[in-house]
């Protein structure tokens, strides 16, 4: 019993194809029936010099890829946003996951890129002023201002020298107290100003978020939602916009 045989259609060269590049538009090639068997096979023809497409099982039309390539170049306006023209043979140049990532990055834009937050130097300065003022005041009040010695055990000249020393020390401590109070005042004022500015910014941001812009929209996953003004009651509603499918070209090729 002869082995099971399959049939494959391959493109046969016409008389114009043998003449070389003098005929740019060759006649549509015919279809030739070729037998595939497990037994001794007939000698094959010499392989052409150009790139050869990989063999596939079933019926294969050799002129399909070339016609599709010409159609892509003749109709460039039919390609939609987010879909790239596929190379001959319907093989995509990038995997599907990478194309989806590129489309999401193009939709989101550079607004969602991670931005490093600057250090709040005003808040840090206010804290430094407050801590410095507290330390100065506490230190000035912790140091004694009078000599704690028995005047009977010390001579008059030594007692006078100690009094002069503590008088100068008291003046320096008073200056430290004044400086500490000044630092506390400056730190408190700066902290209050920063608090007021932050409250004003938060209020402005809250008003800005509640009032929808002209082209405001938000992206959730693969669905774009935007606000649209209704004609009747003047309210607002979320409208769903379909995202352009990146793999639409591949589905079209599979259906054809």
Curated annotation (Swiss-Prot):
InterPro entries: TMEM74-like. It is a multi-pass membrane protein. Residues 97-108 have a biased composition (Basic and acidic residues). The keyword Transmembrane applies. This is Transmembrane protein 74B. Keywords: Membrane, Transmembrane, Transmembrane helix. Coiled coil: none annotated. The gene is TMEM74B. Belongs to the TMEM74 family. The chain crosses the membrane at residues 123-143, 177-197. Residues 1-111 are annotated as: Disordered. The lineage of its organism: Eukaryota, Metazoa, Chordata, Craniata, Vertebrata. The keyword Transmembrane applies. Residues 80-96 have a biased composition (Low complexity). One of its GO terms (cellular component) is membrane. It comes from Homo sapiens. It is found in: Membrane.
